From Swiss-Prot:
Its main location: secreted. This is Beta-defensin 131A. Residues 1-22 form the signal peptide. Keywords: Antibiotic, Antimicrobial, Defensin, Disulfide bond, Secreted, Signal. Has antibacterial activity. Upon stimulation with lipoteichoic acid, promotes cytokines and chemokines production and secretion. The lineage of its organism: Eukaryota, Metazoa, Chordata, Craniata, Vertebrata. GO terms for cellular component: extracellular space. It comes from Pan troglodytes. Disulfide bonds join C29-C57, C37-C51, C41-C58. It is found in: Secreted.
Length: 71
């Protein structure tokens, strides 16, 4: 009987707790040219968010060079 109550308690808790990902937020990658939905980002990219199909939205890393160092 206790096991049955435990199972029902766990099931009710699973259905009352909201999911980690909000359905209100935008799950799509922005339509700019440097965003891509992939399963793994390349070495020159970093992850931004999850896409609708649970792939990762990747963006190119912007590396700025601030001139040469002087000794």
């Amino acid at each position: 009987m206790r096991v049955l109550f435990f199972v029902f308690g766990v099931l009710s808790l699973m259905f009352t707790v909201p999911p980690a990902r909000s359905f209100i937020s935008n799950d799509e990658c922005p339509s700019e040219y440097y965003y891509h939905c992939r399963l793994k980002c390349n070495a020159d990219e970093h992850a931004i968010r999850y896409c609708a199909d649970f792939s990762i939205c990747c963006k190119l890393k912007i590396i700025e060079i601030h001139g040469q160092k002087k000794w």
